[in-house]
């Protein structure tokens, strides 16, 4: 019997939470460091560590699970991406593809000898407007 199961609750609907976590995960993998609030970072740390562990398996099934969890869209472009491609800039063409590649190629090999604990949270000063605890979540430089 599990009493008081932890749930990610930040005052949004479940679909909004799911999309927000997927977007934050993509940003964290792409930039390897993001600034956010402490409750979001604590939840993101759980998911980021699971994604790196999944990437270390390096199987087709693991890639498909990662694509699903990150909500990667291969065949659609956002308005911004479409404008950049039309202007001739192909560097921003479907960033999600590069995120999956970086997860499985760069991060999985970097943490191949490590068994968990791939991220760290550094606390910052509180935000001025609403006094929310800010922090930086980043992958270790192992």
UniProtKB/Swiss-Prot annotation:
Instruction: List residues traversing the bilayer.
Output: none
Q: Which GO terms describe its biological process?
A: translation
Q: PROSITE patterns this protein is in?
A: RIBOSOMAL_L17 (PS01167)
- Recorded GO terms, molecular function? structural constituent of ribosome
A GO CC annotation given for this chain: cytosolic large ribosomal subunit
* A Pfam short name: Ribosomal_L17
Sorted alphabetically, the keyword list is: Ribonucleoprotein, Ribosomal protein
Quaternary structure per UniProt?
A: Part of the 50S ribosomal subunit. Contacts protein L32.
Q: Which family does it belong to?
A: Belongs to the bacterial ribosomal protein bL17 family.
Q: Mind telling me what this protein is named?
A: Large ribosomal subunit protein bL17
The gene for this chain is rplQ
């Amino acid at each position: 019997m599990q009493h008081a199961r932890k749930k990610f609750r930040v005052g949004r609907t479940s679909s909004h939470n799911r999309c927000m976590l997927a977007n934050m995960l993509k940003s964290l993998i792409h930039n390897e460091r993001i600034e956010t609030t402490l409750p979001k970072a604590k939840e993101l740390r759980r998911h980021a560590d699971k994604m790196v562990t999944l990437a270390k398996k390096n199987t087709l099934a693991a890639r498909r699970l990662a694509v699903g969890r990150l909500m990667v869209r291969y065949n659609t472009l956002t308005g911004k991406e479409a404008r950049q491609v039309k202007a001739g800039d192909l560097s921003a063409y479907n960033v999600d593809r590069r995120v999956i590649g970086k997860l499985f190629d760069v991060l999985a090999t970097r943490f191949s000898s490590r068994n968990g604990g791939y991220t760290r949270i550094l606390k910052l000063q509180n935000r001025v407007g609403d006094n929310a605890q800010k922090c930086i979540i980043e992958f270790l430089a192992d």
